[in-house]
Amino acid sequence: MKSKRVMGIAIGHDEIVGIKAYKIEGTIVLEDVIVQKRHSNKGTDVKEFFEYYGEVGISIGCVFESSLQSVYMETPMMHKIDQYLFAHREGKRIFQNEDFPNAIDFASRPGTTEELMCMLIVALERKQVKQVAQGIQQGGGDLRVIDYWPAPLAFSRGRESSMLCITPEEDKVQVSLWNDKFCTAHTLVSLDVNEVLEACKTVYEDSKQFQVPYPKGAIVVGFDETRSKAFESILETYGTIDQVPLHIVDKGEDYNPQNINHEMAYGLAIRLLADGK
């Protein structure tokens, strides 16, 4: 049986990538890849993108390139309303920024005992979230989710319970550990491969308190060819994690698995299909 079609959108510094996909008999089918160069702010660019390439009735997920602001913690079990109040209070305290106010979101799951729960609190710059949401809606898009960078990689490579993610963030490297779609620890380091390897150890050590298993592999994506080659020792140490299998048809042939914006959009499409949105 064929699912409804969805569209994942990734807004990078230089381009917007849209991927249209659906699921049939458990297989992800990628049918279209749309790329548009950026020239203005996020809201204007994404509005124009949807005016040209949007369509009525398709569910939209969006992610835009930004600094990773998240914290993972274990707390006593709380009801949903108390989780909401706690997450917003702690999120504002941890990620307080008077110049660029943040929007706070959270997710929770069972903790290491029946009395505890784990909570992931995430912050995104409120102005950018508003720009993107308004741009999509003004362009006629049916927006279902705005995700945080680089969370969609946990879906595009999400077959393992624990994995390292190494991505660029401005002139540094963001090293994060992901456990069943939750970012349990992250740290920002220089481009030096030895620092990155040490950071991989650090995020795992920080995550052991939550009973996160040893990483089953690593993702290195978003770097140029020279830097990717320099980081090969990371993959040799931890192993590689391939993208979730997909079937490509029609204009989906333009999909570039080495392009981080393409993969982010693909990961969002997988999330939308998994959520049934």
What are these regions (language model features)?
Residues 28, 69-73, 228-231:
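Switch/connector loops and helix/strand junctions flanking conserved nucleotide-binding motifs
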Residues 227-240:
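Short, aromatic/basic amphipathic alpha-helical patches
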Residues 1-69:
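Early-domain small/polar-rich strand-loop-helix modules and first-structured segments
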Residues 55-70, 211-227, 246:
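Short glycine-rich phosphate-binding loop at a beta-alpha junction
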Residues 64-119:
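Internal amphipathic helical hairpin motif
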